[in-house]
Regions:
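C-terminus-biased signal that marks the final domain/tail of proteins
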Residues: 70-88, 202-205, 210-211, 220-222, ...
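A contiguous strand-loop segment
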Residues: 74-168, 201, 386-388, 394, ...
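Short, low-complexity intrinsically disordered segments enriched in A/P/G/S/L with frequent Arg
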Residues: 8, 21, 35, 54-55, ...
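Tryptophan (W) side chains
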Residues: 13-15, 22
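Short, Lys/Arg-enriched N-terminal segments with co-localized hydrophobic residues
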Residues: 57, 61-75
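Short hydrophobic targeting helices and cationic amphipathic motifs
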Residues: 27, 37-38, 42, 59
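Catalytic cofactor-binding cores of redox enzymes
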Residues: 196-234
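Proteins synthesized as precursors that undergo proteolytic processing into mature forms
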Residues: 167-203, 315-323
Length: 399
């Protein structure tokens, strides 16, 4: 997404630039429905050099020229599922700045043009967080009207996409979420399509590298992880119901063996029965639970918190509990410093009631929960519906 403002220098995520995009010129000041958009025409000035690309040049309708810096992205994210009376699916997206993300509803029969397989129209409507490039929703996470959810998380250094293969469904990384959610009602449906799918190394725009991702795919019955590595496409059962970044998922899951002694219950003296040891604090059954922000530690912590979370069955109680689960691995400004002197933070946390099609979210600046109900939109419409994020902190003053 474009780093929004009136200056001539912007920052853009590396794989979502089309020939023509829209940017929100009042992103910070006007995040509501009145946000103003202007078209921008982009032309690539140079190819990618290592981890940082050279500038792109663009001109606005007013004819002014400016430069855009493109950088590699190492987002540290966490996705999770949770079930009470309904099924919930969501994630934290962690990075140092926002790309202009919006909650976006894609209606049924919406046209997509796949790079290798031509045009198709979605069978099911979907809602999620996306950057909309032109009329193309580039989803980070989404759920369709049947209750199937998908989230893409960074997988740098291990994700490998391959050339197109005859006899395969050749899908680009940025096409995966709408392709699966537009056609599949369940994880089992997705498994069937994945059996003959090949993730291809096709970028969204010319001269732009693809995003290195892996995905969590879930419904109210099962959860899987999808990874494309140098030895091919892998679909793993995900009994933990969470996903972070590196290492590859089998290693993340195996690491839970090191923590099987953890318990939410009070601990006894198993160290030395003859030594007088006392549990001097509540919570000591979970001594050793990781608390740092590395992806492996976040996987363990999120898996433990999710597995032991208890919630009431109401919508309000369930949604609140889901945000608490992901809150256990959120990032605060100042705790994860980057090489450029900036800090990675949890830009947004999402929680979608997949059964009802309600997408809840909070942002770093606004801890109040905001919601969009996809069923209140025209799901048989012809256009995307997007809602800019409400980022200004909402405080309820008591009188």
């Amino acid at each position: 997404g474009v780093g929004f403002g009136k200056d001539a220098l912007f920052t853009i995520w590396r794989w979502i630039i089309p020939r023509r995009v829209w940017y929100n010129i009042n992103h910070t000041e006007n995040a509501g429905a009145d946000a103003h958009h202007r078209p921008v025409n982009l032309t690539a000035a140079a190819m990618c050099r290592g981890r940082t690309m050279s500038a792109l040049t663009f001109s606005t309708q007013e004819g002014r020229a400016a430069s855009i810096i493109i950088k590699g992205v190492f987002t540290m994210c966490t996705a999770a599922t949770y079930t009470t009376d309904s099924f919930y699916f969501g994630r934290n997206l962690d990075y140092e700045f926002s790309y202009g993300d919006e909650v976006t509803v894609t209606p049924r029969a919406y046209p997509f043009s796949l790079r290798c397989m031509g045009d198709f129209r979605t069978k099911y409507a979907m809602i999620g967080m996306a950057y909309v490039a032109g009329e193309y929703p580039l989803y980070y996470d989404a759920v369709n009207e049947k209750g199937l959810g998908i989230a893409g998380l960074n997988f740098v250094g291990n994700a490998v996409y391959h050339p197109a293969q005859d006899g395969k469904s050749n899908v680009a990384q940025f096409e995966l979420i709408p392709w699966l959610l537009g056609r599949c009602a369940t994880v089992q449906d997705a498994r069937t399509l994945l059996d003959r799918m090949n993730l291809v190394d096709t970028p969204f725009g010319e001269g732009l590298p693809v995003a290195s991702l892996h995905w969590m795919i879930a419904d109210n019955h099962e959860c899987i992880t999808l990874e494309s590595t140098k030895d091919g496409l892998h679909v793993y059962d995900n009994p933990a119901g969470v996903l972070t970044n590196n290492p590859p998922f089998p290693m993340q899951l195996f690491a839970l063996n090191n923590y099987m002694q953890l318990s939410p219950k009070a601990t006894g003296n198993h160290f030395a029965p003859n030594v007088p040891l006392n549990a001097y604090s509540r919570g000591m059954g979970a001594m050793g639970l990781p608390g740092d922000l590395s992806s492996q530690s976040r996987f363990v912590r999120a898996a433990f918190v999710r597995a032991n979370s208890r919630s009431g069955e109401s919508e309000a109680e369930s949604v609140s509990q889901f945000f608490h689960i992901l809150g256990s691995v959120e990032q605060q400004r100042g705790c994860c410093e980057l090489d450029n002197g900036k800090y990675e933070i949890t830009l947004y946390t999402s929680c979608c009631n997949a059964d009802k099609g309600i997408y809840y979210y909070t942002t770093y600046e606004n801890s109040q929960i905001t919601a969009v109900d996809m069923h209140k939109e025209d799901m048989d419409g012809t256009e995307l519906v997007s809602y800019p994020l409400v980022k200004e902190q909402q405080i309820r003053w008591m009188k």
